[in-house]
Structures are given as structure tokens and as C-alpha cells.
Amino acid sequence: MNPIMKSSAHHKLYLLATFWTLGLLFLGSIVHATGSSLACPDWPTCYGTMFPKMTGGIFWEHLHRLVAGALVILFAVATWVGWKAEDKRPGIRIWSCVGILLLLVQSVFVALTVILKLPYAISTTHLALAFLFLTLVTVLTAVTSPQSTTVEKQNLKKLSDVEKIGVLSAVLIFGQSVLGGVVRHTGAGLVCADVPLCF
């Protein structure tokens, strides 16, 4: 049997990490929507402790931090299992390490977001990094699935028209999401009082 077909443990972990990341993004939106982003004034602790009283905005903000911390551990385990698996494709190992690097950089931006009191540039970068990581872990989930048997390098010229449209759509969605983050973090959501026109 193809060794790639047998190596499904890291695929399952990447799949779990994908849904975990989606949940974390949703939780992050709740934190912002409830005005809880600065409910914990310090980082990585909350009022000097890792176990604050989980009430009001502290509940959402600290829960967001705990779930994010669990994601770092989950993805690190997935990467380790992937390295130990029979699937030796270098691209998977490289991009897994890139994922860990993204999570570490993301942690720095989380700290800066709290310390600098939500500057919109850093908050938007925090959101953009989250979407980049979601993209990365989704791709890792796809290429480690039992259905994925492609081991050859593929470039953009070899993509079908449908695949090119998919890539373009992903880029546009990412751009729109980041732009939406800028609008939200700068408080410009209601600058235009009517839709689809603006004044």
C-alpha cells in the first residue's frame, strides 16, 4: 500500500487543527463584538494570574487565549507526528514548520495588541495572520488526506482553469477579510449611512 495512504494520523490532527482554528476565529469575533479585547490588561496572564475569575469580558478574552494556546500545542503535535510518519514529502515538513513560525509571530502580535491597547494596524495584522494560518492548515489537511496521492511538484501553469479560479477566489476572500478588519478596527463600519450607495 502507498505509505501516504497509511499515514493518516497527522492528517486527522491537521483536520482537527483546521476546525479548531475556525472556532478560534469565531471566538475572536465574539471578543471584539462584546468589547472584551482589553478585558485582561496584561499578557500572557490576566490580572497577574492564569486562572482569573471568568466573568464578563474576562470570560471571552481569557477563553480566547486558552483556546489559542491549545491550538499551538495541537499544531505542534500534528507537526511532530507528521515528521515521524512515513510520508516524507519535504513540502509538508517545510510548511508545517512555517505554520509553527506563524503561530509564534501571532503570539507576539497578540502581546503587542494588549500592551499597545489595540492599535488598528497591529489588530488587523493579527487578523491577517489568523487567516494565513487557516489557509496553511487547510492546505496541509488536504495534501495529507488519503485521497491525496500527488507527490510531484506542481506549479501554477499546471493548474486547471477551475483550480486557478479557486486560487483567485481565495486571494480575493483573504483581501476582503483583511479590508473588513481594517474597517472594523478603525470604527469605519457606519461611515456610509446607506447601502449600496454612500451618501
Tell me the role of every PLM-derived stretch:
Residues N2-F199:
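Polytopic transmembrane helical bundles with strong interfacial aromatic enrichment
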